[in-house]
Structure formats: structure tokens, C-alpha cells
Swiss-Prot record:
Family, per entry: Belongs to the UPF0538 family.
InterPro entries: UPF0538 (IPR018794)
The protein's name in its UniProt record: UPF0538 protein C2orf76 homolog
Pfam families: DUF2340
Amino acid sequence: MAAEEATLTVRLIRSFEHRNFKPVVYHGVNLHQTVKEFIIFLKQDVPLRTSLPPPLRNYKYDTLKILHQAHKAKTNELVLGLEDDDTLLLKEDRTLKDSGVASETEIAFFCGEDYKRYKANPISSW
């Protein structure tokens, strides 16, 4: 089977409370790789991106969640929607394609512990 390649936007979320995030576009992403393989790639790539400020490059990202899929409705949340975790949080043992990721999908990359704290008390600092 030929590798399916896609363009994905990964939103690096440093802080939910302060709405501190930065999108990074990746071209030619293989949708048949597992979520775990993509996380490993991101953890290796993000620290090397000199265009990102150090607080975003050197953070403990570990979780991916689908923010928006092309040609579908967007959430009103400014940083990340807190609903539908069962379907939108990507499981490491599945492929990106099996998880619902397609070309032009926007994915959030963040620290799972930060997300749990924010979900329990979703207050913004500004």
C-alpha cells in the first residue's frame, strides 16, 4: 500500500490558562504511521525549530487531540475544545488515518496533565 501523505497543522499548546500556543505546519506526513511514531517525530522536531520561542520548544508535550478537520465545523474554544475526548484524543497504538486524521487536519500537541487540570477548572488568566 502506498503511503498516504498529508499536510497537518500542529498547534503547540504551552499554557491553556494563558492561551499560549503556536501553530506549526507539517507537509508530507505519512498517515499510516502510528500516533506514537508521530509523537516521537514531533518531540524530536519541535526543539530544533529555531523559529519557535524557547518556552514552546522546550516543553513536555505528550498528547495529541484533533482540533479541526477540513470542511467540518470548528469549536468556539480559543485554545482547545474540552468535549469529545473519547473520539478526538489520539490513541498511541492507532494509525493517524484510523484516528480520523486526514489532510488539512489541525491537531493540538500538549501536556496531558495540564489538560486534565484545565478541564477540571477551565479558567483563563486574561
